[in-house]
Amino acid sequence: MLRVILSVVAAVGVVATMPVAAQQSAGPRVPLVQDDTSDPDAQALFKELRARGTSPLNLHRVYGNAPKLARATLAVAQALRYDAIVSRADKELIILRATQLARGDYQFGQHRRLAISCGITVEQIDSLPQWRDSKLFSDRQRAVLAYADAMASAQGVDDATFDAMKAFFNTKEIIELTMNAAYYSASSQISRALRITAEGNPKGGGYGTCR
């Protein structure tokens, strides 16, 4: 019996000292709600997703454990995507940088596909960590990236960075970009805390395409 207890304690200790990335590979911390769920709200959530042309992703199946909140949250995501005037390419660029800074691997992976379909190049995406030294970005894109960096910093957005945004975007567009960066930064925290893992190549194109 003592030997069994010591083995369990040792195993727990190994998990506790594992790097975050290794722990995340263990999979989601909460159940993935399946299609045959008896919860009518979760069923409604999945039905709405399929009506939009995508199968429920792991993110949605985790959210399905709190389906009413999930539907409200995803309604915000839909509004950010489709009810905005700022270009999809600019939105995807700030989302990529915001999720990268928030270490949201799940969201970054999904939006990488979206960004490419919106005209962001693979070379640009790969150079995001060193974007300040890159010649691949326009002045407009550099203003967006600097804004994302400032939003994620402890110091916040300074006047010079905000003024650079005003040179390319009107007030509504700046608010839309700000909300996209903030929303997906928060979503990244959720996916990290709950260890939401990628699906590989999901049916329905993941988060969709630039349309």
Write out the residue ranges for each language-model feature.
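Hydrophobic alpha-helical segments
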Residues: V14-R211
